[in-house]
Curated annotation (Swiss-Prot):
Homodimer. This is Histidinol-phosphate aminotransferase 3. Its cofactor is pyridoxal 5'-phosphate. Gene3D superfamilies: Aspartate Aminotransferase, domain 1, Type I PLP-dependent aspartate aminotransferase-like (Major domain). It comes from Burkholderia lata (strain ATCC 17760 / DSM 23089 / LMG 22485 / NCIMB 9086 / R18194 / 383).
Length: 370
């Protein structure tokens, strides 16, 4: 006989009304030979770096009976040094904040600057978690569709800002799922118009093409700008779950008001610091990934497919009358990609050369059956 506590269904619980028809967000996690669906760096850390990270975590374990540094000063210093190196803008530790993935950073931003009676503005197709952040913080989300080539219609964006007066504007550059980057002048114009904070989500910034600037370059002139980044993508540290942002020190103080106590464990801090010390090694395959991306774009276009320009480590391509059939056909051949973006499109993460060869062979096989 099943015990009562195990027999209770979700529908039996006194769940909040707004959650009753919701589904938990998450990409498929399947055991397949070629996994190209969640935009990870396909190259693992070297054995030597694994050992250094393990040593750092072991050192932290010696004080595991104590709470970690709640303001993670060492990690913020390492992140500030990296941003300064990457962008050429001097960033100090007081202008950096971090959490368990940039998901948590953006959620904290919505907790601090959104909430009941306030709104946010995003541009679709956009990262689907923005919906989740707004729902869980009771922030009303306004959306504006991108143009046919997935750019922003700047005039419409400015009109929407004037109409809705959002507390938070969410910009994604490079955008997920399209891969397209925003012109820096468009970001500047939105900053000039926005009454609240402007978030530029740069999770994929390290993959941007040469000559595409980071929004971090705008920070000195715009105290309400927040640029979010992550170690999960280019830094091949997805398992470490560390995201961060650069912003005015006053915004850091605002985020401290909503963070949970000791939200970054001592082990997370130690591992991330070790990874950042080895930043050259962690980022050593970025140029190879960019080259593979560009060749993938050319190859897909050679098949007559529509492919969005990409400054990320993934490519969105279509247009398919039945994208699920293509996705399923690839999966049957051991290749997992993502049904993401507008319905005619699919998204493929850039993997190793061997993984991309498998993807190309599988796609040709599936398309031959159409």
């Amino acid at each position: 006989m099943q015990q009562p506590w195990k027999a209770v269904a979700l529908s039996d619980l006194p769940l909040r009304e707004d959650l009753k028809l919701q589904h938990a967000y998450g990409a498929p996690q399947l055991d397949v030979p070629v996994c190209l669906n969640v935009n990870e760096n396909p190259y693992p850390p070297s054995p030597a770096l694994v050992e250094r990270i393990a040593t750092a975590v072991a050192d932290a374990a010696r004080a595991a009976n104590r709470y970690p540094d709640r303001d993670f000063a060492a990690l913020r210093s390492h992140l500030a040094a990296y941003l300064t190196h990457d962008t050429g803008v001097t960033v100090d530790a007081s202008s950096v904040w971090a959490a368990n993935g940039s998901n948590e950073v953006i959620q904290q931003i919505l907790q601090a600057f959104g909430g009941p009676g306030r709104s946010a503005l995003a541009f679709t197709p956009a990262y689907p978690m923005y919906d989740e952040y707004c729902r869980t913080t009771f922030t009303r989300l306004h959306t504006l569709p991108r143009t046919e080539d997935f750019a922003l219609d700047l005039n419409q964006a400015l009109d929407s800002i004037r109409a809705h007066q959002p507390g938070v504007v969410l910009l994604t550059s490079p955008n997920n799922p399209t891969g397209t980057a925003l012109p820096i002048d468009d970001i500047r114009a939105i900053l000039d118009a926005a009454p609240g904070v402007v978030v530029v989500d740069e999770a994929y910034a390290e993959f941007r093409r040469h000559g595409v600037p980071s929004a971090v370059t705008l920070l000195p002139a715009y105290p309400r700008l927040i640029v979010t980044r992550t170690l999960s993508k280019a830094f091949k540290f997805a398992g470490g779950r560390v995201g961060y942002c650069a912003c005015a020190p006053a915004i850091v103080e605002a985020l401290k008001l909503v963070r949970l106590p000791y939200h970054l464990s001592a082990f997370t801090q130690a591992a991330a610091c070790a990874a950042l010390v080895a930043r050259d090694e962690m980022l050593s395959q970025v140029e190879a990934i960019k080259a593979e991306r560009d060749s993938t774009v050319d190859w897909l276009r050679g098949l007559g497919l529509t492919v969005a320009d990409s400054d990320a480590n993934f490519v969105m391509f279509g247009e398919f009358a039945d994208r699920h059939r293509i996705w399923s056909g690839l999966l049957r051949r051991g290749v997992l990609i993502r049904e993401s973006g507008p319905p005619p499109y699919l998204r493929v993460s850039i993997g190793t050369g061997a993984e991309m060869a498998a993807f190309r062979a599988a796609l040709l096989d599936v398309m031959a059956l159409e």
